[in-house]
Amino acid sequence: MFKNLSLKVIVFGFIFTFFSSFGQSFFLGIFNTSIRETLSITHGQFGSIYASATLCSSLLLIWVGKKIDDINIFRFAIYVTLLLSFSCFFFSKISSIVFLFSAIFLMRFSGQGMMSHTATTTVSRYFTKSRGRALSICWFGLSSAEFILPVLMVFLLSLIHI
């Protein structure tokens, strides 16, 4: 079906779409209640902060996203992975409204934005004939994460009683 390099590119795309989940709403929503309780904010306030941070991250994606054409894809992927790692750490330290906005901005930008963008651009770049099939397999990573991560995270949070 796919040759050696092609398989590696598809696995790369699958992994990047899987881990884009850390910036997706279905994952971040797991922490909604605990964040609102910690910061004493309403659903509406949280939603406004979330929407604003998402909009700002998408605006930045317009500028940063084009850099993938100027930088070696391996190096670009490392930068994106490091940014997502930092974003997850930063998200775990939310202690104020400003931190909340910044953390959501970083998670949405690095996770939902850059991880997805890197996966799609890389797979699209390597495939011409079977691009649709390759992208479908790549995006199965997100579907897998939507099934696995919420259950796993709720289980892990129950172990530490959060």
Regions found by a protein language model. Give the residues of each.
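Extracytoplasmic
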Residues: 9-43, 61-64, 149-153
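Hydrophobic core of transmembrane alpha-helices in multi-pass small-molecule transporters
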Residues: 18, 98-114
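Juxtamembrane helix-start elements in MFS-like secondary transporters
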Residues: 41-50, 135
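Residue-level signature of mid-helix packing/kink "hotspots" within the transmembrane helices
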Residues: 54-62, 146-147
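Conserved MFS/SLC helix-loop-helix module at the cytosolic interface between two early adjacent transmembrane helices
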Residues: 59-97
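Intracellular juxtamembrane helix-capping segments at the cytosolic ends
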Residues: 113-127
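Glycine-rich segments within core transmembrane alpha-helices of 12-TM secondary carriers
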Residues: 130-150
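Conserved small/polar residues in nucleotide/adenosyl-binding loops
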Residues: 160-162
